């Protein structure tokens, strides 16, 4: 079971990725984790990646695809894997295909931008302890105050509306072509494209996912 996950920041992708990993016993493959591991291990691709990063440049698709090929050859990927954060572009998707890496399911979590902004802009944090709240879903006992210390809660920069909307803009620019690409792949019978309503309760989405992937 080889799965690609698509979903905007705040769409609940991470929660459902954990569910899939635990339910089906397949590892999540993150390109960032792979890069760090390869550099630390000093593999040939790791050395190439390190020299590129040290020069302040972006790691090429060729190196990333090579790392993915090495990673999925490992024993824990025998039953499949979950690709998160890759591919981000059409050339990367083409690269996977050219390397003979078949994708069984492309899973998209669909949540309207305004809902994501509400989810993220409603977050409040007590920075010294790391405790987090939400104005709607998990409000503090007293508005704007930490439950334990009574200290002021803040909105983290990442959760500010303008930051969230900027990240969503980047996501849509990158991902819209991929959604079209994998839609065509599904029509051609090369993969299955599954779309879920990410505004539903977490357990409900998990149940739908389990049924669709079973």
Curated annotation (Swiss-Prot):
Biological role: Catalyzes the reversible transfer of the terminal phosphate group between ATP and AMP. Plays an important role in cellular energy homeostasis and in adenine nucleotide metabolism.
Pathway(s) it belongs to: Purine metabolism; AMP biosynthesis via salvage pathway; AMP from ADP: step 1/1
GO molecular function, one term: ATP binding
Keywords for this protein: ATP-binding, Cytoplasm, Kinase, Nucleotide biosynthesis, Nucleotide-binding, Transferase
Residues annotated to bind AMP: 31, 36, 57-59, 85-88, 92, 156, 167
Assembly: Monomer.
LID: annotated segments: 122-159
Protein origin, superkingdom: Bacteria
Top enzyme category: transferase
UniProt organism field: Vibrio atlanticus (strain LGP32) (Vibrio splendidus (strain Mel32))
InterPro entries documented for this protein: Adenyl_kin_sub, Adenylat/UMP-CMP_kin, Adenylat_kinase_CS, Adenylate_kinase_lid-dom, P-loop_NTPase
Region span, NMP: 30-59
Protein name: Adenylate kinase
Gene3D superfamilies: P-loop containing nucleotide triphosphate hydrolases (3.40.50.300)
């Amino acid at each position: 079971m080889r799965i690609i996950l698509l979903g905007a920041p705040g769409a609940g992708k991470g929660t459902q990725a954990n569910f899939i990993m635990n339910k089906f016993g397949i590892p999540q493959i993150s390109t960032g984790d792979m890069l760090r591991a390869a550099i630390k291990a000093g593999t040939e691709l790791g050395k190439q990646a390190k020299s590129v990063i040290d020069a302040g440049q972006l790691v090429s698709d060729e190196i990333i695809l090579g790392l993915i090929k090495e990673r999925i050859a490992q024993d824990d990927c025998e039953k499949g894997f979950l690709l998160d954060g890759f591919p981000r572009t059409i050339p990367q998707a083409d690269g996977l295909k050219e390397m003979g890496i078949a994708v069984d399911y492309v899973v998209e979590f669909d949540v309207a931008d305004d809902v994501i902004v509400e989810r993220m802009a409603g977050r409040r944090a007590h920075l010294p302890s790391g405790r987090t709240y939400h104005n709607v879903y998990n409000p503090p006992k007293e508005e704007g105050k930490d439950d334990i210390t009574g200290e002021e809660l803040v909105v983290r920069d990442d959760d500010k509306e303008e930051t969230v909307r900027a990240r969503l803009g980047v996501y849509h620019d990158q991902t819209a072509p991929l959604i079209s690409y994998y839609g065509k792949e599904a029509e051609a019978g090369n993969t299955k494209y599954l779309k879920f309503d990410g505004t539903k309760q977490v357990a409900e989405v998990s149940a739908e996912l389990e049924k669709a992937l079973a």
